[in-house]
Amino acid sequence: MARAVHRSGLVALGIATALMASCAFAAKDVVVAVGSNFTTLDPYDANDTLSQAVAKSFYQGLFGLDKEMKLKNVLAESYTVSDDGITYTVKLREGIKFQDGTDFNAVAVKANLDRASDPANHLKRYNLYKNIAKTEAIDPTTVKITLKQPFSAFINILAHPATAMISPAALEKYGKEIGFHPVGTGPYELDTWNQTDFVKVKKFAGYWQPGLPKLDSITWRPVADNNTRAAMLQTGEAQFAFPIPYEQATLLEKNKNIELMASPSIMQRYISMNVTQKPFDNPKVREALNYAINRPALVKVAFAGYATPATGVVPPSIAYAQSYKPWPYDPVKARELLKEAGYPNGFSTTLWSSHNHSTAQKVLQFTQQQLAQVGIKAQVTAMDAGQRAAEVEGKGQKESGVRMFYTGWSASTGEADWALSPLFASQNWPPTLFNTAFYSNKQVDDFLAQALKTNDPAEKTRLYKAAQDIIWQESPWIPLVVEKLVSAHSKNLTGFWIMPDTGFSFEDADLQ
């Protein structure tokens, strides 16, 4: 009798164990392999798109952008703008809670915009909000934002990934450490952040949208090596990978369990030249370097065809972008210009990269070889996020070691101001923003400022074109390519995709 009871107990235990294993297997856990590490989980203090993309796990804004970079309501229901373009009145959704149980309301919006617009906080994204004069909570669901002057792109600023709503209680509790303790209204909350290895987020049970999220967890894992990232997808260690090494795209397409996606982007890759330093202060040198780079060949060598040669300084899908005749590859012309500029034997310089992943390494090697053919010896350095923050973003013109700098920019507002002002306006030299060419032109500054004071599309077009015409002629950059975004995912993962600004959309993601 005792033996029979023992056996049935074992059977019951076995069934229970099997059920537990089945439940564990059925958990909807997704691993996402990404190209670099995260700098912070505070969107207002992140300069990189990836950190802001991961922060969307926890955070939402009043507005957002869809796959076509069109404005959509998120925590806001609607907005109005005063006739003088100074006052924005935003109506908020009701009944939304932060992940710490506190209410999302107008007071919370005020707390976030007050923090963002206060220069004393030294937040990296301060320049997005410096035009805010004051924010008022009119009632729990109504916010009035008054600007210092008309700024026609302001609603796009509120849709930028940096403009996240953080719990005021968490801001009070954690202060400057909020970047390690995210608390928002988003679909996921922080589980673990191993700063050298991964960020894991888990489902927020109190999320305000019914039926969401559908995943139990997402683990964001930085994997710098392109081939390793692709291998993780093939072995099942990851369910989503971005960016995919272009040279492996064809191989992954043949895998019946993987879906490869190539989507449009607003990511422009370029090399800035520090125009305050010799020899790049000479326009003929800058012109020569533009002739020295074979962009169609670069598209094939570094991007395996998943890019197009740049035809301007603003990607074509951004509002008010202008296109120009692409720079032809002409090394003979490049040598002639260098000779005219006083460098018949070329010169030596440095070429830094903002990233150290495999594609960036290929771009550096290709560019180094191209420059060598016209007599320019470039010492290349591929930086990690920490090096970039310290050596490029953190130093002003006098102490900066930047000469040539390979990087990329995606104007996450979808509008030309954010594609031009941070990169070319005189007031936006590092460490303020990202004008790593240290370019300055009063006419350009004036045109950009005037464009923000008008809501007339025809006038904005005229002003932005005038600014871009000057920049294209003076060539503080070597515009290279506009990328196509190549990602891959397990076919049983749905609703997870790349935004044109290289961010992620995953609110509706599910494992089938």
Swiss-Prot record:
SUPFAM superfamilies: Periplasmic binding protein-like II. Coiled coil: none annotated. The keyword Transport applies. The keyword Hydrolase does not apply. Residues 1-26 form the signal peptide. Belongs to the bacterial solute-binding protein 5 family. PANTHER family: GLUTATHIONE-BINDING PROTEIN GSIB (PTHR30290:SF32), PERIPLASMIC BINDING COMPONENT OF ABC TRANSPORTER (PTHR30290). This is Glutathione-binding protein GsiB. The lineage of its organism: Bacteria, Pseudomonadati, Pseudomonadota, Gammaproteobacteria, Enterobacterales. The gene is gsiB.
